[in-house]
Amino acid sequence: METSMPEYYEVFGEFRGVLMDKRFTKYWEDVEMFLARPDDLVIATYPKSGTTWISEVVYMIYKEGDVEKCKEDAIFNRIPYLECRNEDLINGIKQLKEKESPRIVKTHLPPKLLPASFWEKNCKMIYLCRNAKDVAVSYYYFLLMITSYPNPKSFSEFVEKFMQGQVPYGSWYDHVKAWWEKSKNSRVLFMFYEDMKEDIRREVVKLIEFLERKPSAELVDRIIQHTSFQEMKNNPSTNYTMMPEEMMNQKVSPFMRKGIIGDWKNHFPEALRERFDEHYKQQMKDCTVKFRMEL
C-alpha cells in the first residue's frame, strides 16, 4: 500500500479538512466567489450515491416530462458540476455562469465548502445519500475507470482509505452528518437512495412537491419510465459514454454498473465487514440519521 501513497497524494490533497482533487482546488477562488441566483437548485451528494439518477428525475420535472428535451445534451452539460475543473477542458463554474435561469447545480461538496452565496440566496437544495457500504463498492469501481486517478489497488485497501476519509471528498460520515444537520432547514430536502429504490413513485411525488410543481399521474409515470436504471444505462445522454475514453474508461467498469442495494455483500469479506461495522457504529453513534444496508 505504501508504494501507492506518493502517487495518490500527488493527485489528491487535504483542503480545509477534506481530501480533494488538486485540479479542483487550484482555482478555488472561482468556486468560493460563485454568485448563486435565488432560483438555483442545488443537488448535493457524496460521490456514488445516485447523483445522476436524481439529477435526471429533477431535470424531467423541470422539463415537464419532455423526454426529447432531456436527450438534447449530455447530463453533465445540462446540469453542470459546480467545482469540477480540469484547466480549460472542464470548468463547471464557467458552464453555470453561461446557463439561463433556472439553473440546476450538481455538487459533491460538504456544506462548509459550498459557496456562501447559495445559503445567502436561500436556494433550495436536495441531498441524496446512500448507505456507506454500497457507496464504498461503487466508489471503488468508479476510481478504477477514471484514467487520471491512481489505481485504488485492492478493495480492502480502498475500504481502509474510505473509513479514514482518505478518498476524494473526504469522510462519508462527516459529509452525511453535516448535510443531515442542514436539512433542519425546510429549503433542504434530505433523501435516501434506498427509499427511491423501494418506492420511486412516492419519492418522485415528494420531489415534485418540494419543487412546487403539480404532480400528475401522467408526469410521474413518464419520469419513472425514463429514469429506470436500464433506460438510463442505455441512454447516451445519461450513461457518460459522451465523456471521452481518455477521461473515463468504461471498458474497465461501466459508469452505470448495477444500481442495486446490498451489492456490498459480494465484496466485503467477513473480517472487513466486522471492522467496517464497528467503525461505522463509532462514527455514527451521535447521529440520528438511520440507513438501510439492504431492503
UniProtKB/Swiss-Prot annotation:
Q: Name one GO cellular component term.
A: cytoplasm
Give me the residues that bind 3'-phosphoadenylyl sulfate, please: 48-53, 130, 138, 193, 227-232, 257-259
On this chain, the residues bearing Phosphoserine are 156
**What tissues harbor this protein?**
Testis and at very low level in the placenta.
- Entry EC no(s): 2.8.2.4
Q: Which EC class does it fall in?
A: transferase
Compartment(s): Cytoplasm, Cytosol
Q: Name one Pfam family in it.
A: Sulfotransfer_1
Q: Could you name the domain of life of the organism this protein comes from? A: Eukaryota
Residue numbers binding substrate: 106-108
Mind listing the GO molecular function terms for this protein? estrone sulfotransferase activity; steroid binding; steroid sulfotransferase activity; sulfotransferase activity
Recorded catalytic reaction(s): these are: estrone + 3'-phosphoadenylyl sulfate = estrone 3-sulfate + adenosine 3',5'-bisphosphate + H(+); 17beta-estradiol + 3'-phosphoadenylyl sulfate = 17beta-estradiol 3-sulfate + adenosine 3',5'-bisphosphate + H(+); (24S)-hydroxycholesterol + 3'-phosphoadenylyl sulfate = (24S)-hydroxycholesterol 3-sulfate + adenosine 3',5'-bisphosphate + H(+); 3beta-hydroxyandrost-5-en-17-one + 3'-phosphoadenylyl sulfate = dehydroepiandrosterone 3-sulfate + adenosine 3',5'-bisphosphate + H(+)
Annotated active site residues, numbered on this chain, are 108 (proton acceptor)
* GO annotation terms (biological process): estrogen metabolic process; female pregnancy; sulfation
Q: Which InterPro entries match?
A: P-loop_NTPase (IPR027417), Sulfotransferase_dom (IPR000863)
What this protein is reported to do is described as: Sulfotransferase that utilizes 3'-phospho-5'-adenylyl sulfate (PAPS) as sulfonate donor to catalyze the sulfate conjugation of estradiol and estrone. Is a key enzyme in estrogen homeostasis, the sulfation of estrogens leads to their inactivation. Also sulfates dehydroepiandrosterone, pregnenolone, (24S)-hydroxycholesterol and xenobiotic compounds like ethinylestradiol, equalenin, diethyl stilbesterol and 1-naphthol at significantly lower efficiency. Does not sulfonate cortisol, testosterone and dopamine. May play a role in gut microbiota-host metabolic interaction.
Q: Which family does it belong to?
A: Belongs to the sulfotransferase 1 family.
Q: What else is known?
A: Abnormal high expression in liver in obese and diabetogenic C57BL/KSJ-DB/DB strain mice. Female > male. Normal level in liver.
Name of the protein this chain belongs to: Sulfotransferase 1E1
Species this chain originates from: Mus musculus
Q: What is the lineage of its organism?
A: Eukaryota, Metazoa, Chordata, Craniata, Vertebrata
